[in-house]
Amino acid sequence: MWKLKVGEGNGEKDAYIYSTNNYAGRQIWQFDPEAGSDEERAQVEAARLHFYNNRDHLKPSADLLWRMQFLKEKKFKQTIPQVKIKVDGDEEEITYETAATTALRRGVRFFSALQASDGHWPAENAGPLFFLPPLVMCLYITGHLNTVFPAESEHRKEILRYIHYHQNEDGGWGLHIEGHSTMFCTALNYICLRILGQPPHHIACATARNWILDRGGVTLIPSWGKTWLSILGVFDWSGCNPMPPEFWILPSFLPMHPGKMWCYCRMVYMPMSYLYGKRFVGAITPLVVELRQELYPEAEPYHKVNWGKARHLCAKEDAYYPHPWIQDLIWNTLYVFTEPLLTRWPFNKFIREKALQVTMDHIHYEDHNSRYITIGCVEKVLCMLACWVEHPNGDSFKKHLARIPDYLWVAEDGMKMQSFGSQQWDTGFAIQALLASNLIDEIGPVLKRGHEFIKASQVKDNPSGDFKRMYRHISKGSWTFSDQDHGWQVSDCTAEGLKCCLLLSMMPTEIVGEKMEPERLYDSVNILLSLQSKIGGLPAWEPVGAHKWLELLNPTEFFADIVIEHEYVECTSSAIQALTMFSKLYPGHRKKEIDKFIGKAIGYLEDAQMADGSWYGCWGVCFTYGTWFALGGLAAAGKTYTNSPTVRKAVHFLLNSQTQNGGWGESFRSCPQKKYIPLEGNRSNLVQTAWGMMGLLHAGQAERDPAPLHRAAKLLINSQLEDGDFPQEEITGVFMRNCMLHYAAYRNIYPLWALAEYCRRLKDRKILHGFRAPWDSTSNEVNFE
């Protein structure tokens, strides 16, 4: 059976892995053929079968394998009887003791049992279907496929399971698990199947190949796909738009200097430009020759492709961001004039070789400062391949191999590659939800372990050496999205980590442990203050500074807003909440700067509000998520329904978008289309219901008219499962407008948090006691008698 291991290295024999904090937060999967009873194996198989049978209706996994493991290890048994509010009948009495609190206590008890030994909550953080295939391709090219994923191994079985389970009915694969089929992911997953031993006549391969050929073949794959297929030898580098490594030796005053790029864009094109500059191609194996035959139509086989023309081709299914004409003009100029010069003597000797070395220096720097995890999974594989191209037997490549397990995750739908783990992000919200429950006496050890994890996960130092020369910002005092070893500061992760430490510092140390030293809190404040932009908003990773017109040069076809760093509503709100709390507890530290920061940040939030009263959420789906965050920031700064027209408009949006059954349900299509789109059939989603509910609570809805809150609470209470869990529903995370991300822990964190805030706010108003609510009414009006 598969087992999740937490807080461990790869064993004493692996000298190529190291940690800054004894691997706190590290989560890796290992297969033990001797583990598990027949009953446990049967439970796993039942979970797999259930997912398979329902895969057309529910795409995200329920992340059951590690949950089964943890619940068994902790001998968990739900001892609090389940309560439900009757759906039938005219009225149903609800009291604080019998309904909301019972559901809350059951959920807290269940969720506490899922905490790992090091204090964090493990969870899947995946969903995009272009994460895993490049890893398999890289290992195939470097000759390490059988080392990492041996033939006939359980790893291969689970990878194949994942690919098969998420193939769409039309034979293709989407950009993410809920998306329509795209050329990019269909071609990559087809190649992955073939590398892993699936024959071309296998039903999954045959239907995928038909999908590809019916749309003209892989000449229409987007630019990232063209790059990977060129590396493999199934495409030609002359069919790619130029990615000159000379970019990395440009003068820093130029507007398109890489130091001004968004860090993820910079980190993707850094190794890509190295591989392009080398024109690296893997060995042309018999399989590669077969793929050349399989992926091109008979009318235009591989050897007859017009590669120059192919550079600008992109399947309509992939074209979310069509290139503007100015971008194509730049690519054509580089392709026709610049590249022919830079690849000939003496320019190839004195310019290109220098550019390649500088690029590789940056790759090594980033690898070292992330302990070879790198900033994310797309970048990880490219940097690993670049290290192998430079030195196939070098330590850098071996250190990359040692960190591959950090990215792999196993659930009932198979093995997938994570973005890079959401350990700190999930734990920060989990702790806040548990603290809001007011069940401190019941969960003291849970809070203490969580507190220790958060303290252990704070980044203690800035990047090494002259980090500004390497285009890096300060990181000391920050929190990452995953764990300390990752090393990359994130503003909202830092703000949420700071909030946790401040909240826990107000509690008895004998329950939650020693509070964090003030100096470390000051470091966190310093990071947040350093990131605010001129218009008051906060970016996620690095200061905003580049010209917005640079987005015209976005080289991807399926993402938007990826060239430069931008401000985000969620990051800004988190920072407001954290700094407001900090200023109350430490009024003597940089108070004027913090007050000025909050004033500008509130101005940014008010300006960012949409006409309908909502805010666009960049990291969750979508307007519901953004509105919850924005209202939290506004409330922390003293903005109320009474004194703020911004808050009143937001409340109007939330009440108008509440569904018939009291919840909220928003389609992921809201994100790419940038307009509110309800779930099909006006269904509700429990995570989004929690967001909408907490948004109204921030805006004082409990004091004005609690009926909408009662209706939402009824949905959450009645949806809770027998063991205290909540059901998995639609995907709720997003990045770069167009790609969805599955946060498996959200289904526990947010319903718990919403119920906790509901109980706390409404208990204060004594609304829950002795109140008879018309639960079956869909009206937002209620009378007290």
Curated annotation (Swiss-Prot):
Single GO MF descriptor: beta-amyrin synthase activity
Repeat (PFTB) residue spans along the chain: 10-53, 104-146, 156-197, 447-491, 521-566, 598-638, 647-688, 709-750
Active-site positions on this chain: 492 (proton donor)
Protein EC: 5.4.99.39
Keyword vocabulary terms for this entry: Isomerase, Repeat
Substrates-to-products reaction catalysed: (S)-2,3-epoxysqualene = beta-amyrin
Pathway it works in: Secondary metabolite biosynthesis; terpenoid biosynthesis
CDD domains named in the record: SQCY_1
InterPro entries in alphabetical order: SQ_cyclase_C, SQ_cyclase_N, Squalene_cyclase, Terpene_synthase_CS, Terpenoid_cyclase/PrenylTrfase
An annotated GO BP: triterpenoid biosynthetic process
Top-level division of the source organism's lineage: Eukaryota
Enzyme superclass (EC): isomerase
CC annotations in GO: lipid droplet
Function: Oxidosqualene cyclase catalyzing the conversion of 2,3-oxidosqualene (2,3-epoxysqualene) to beta-amyrin, a pentacyclic triterpenoid with anti-inflammatory properties.
Family per similarity comment: Belongs to the terpene cyclase/mutase family.
PANTHER family registered for this protein in UniProt: BETA-AMYRIN SYNTHASE-RELATED (PTHR11764:SF58), TERPENE CYCLASE/MUTASE FAMILY MEMBER (PTHR11764)
Name of protein: Beta-amyrin synthase OSC2
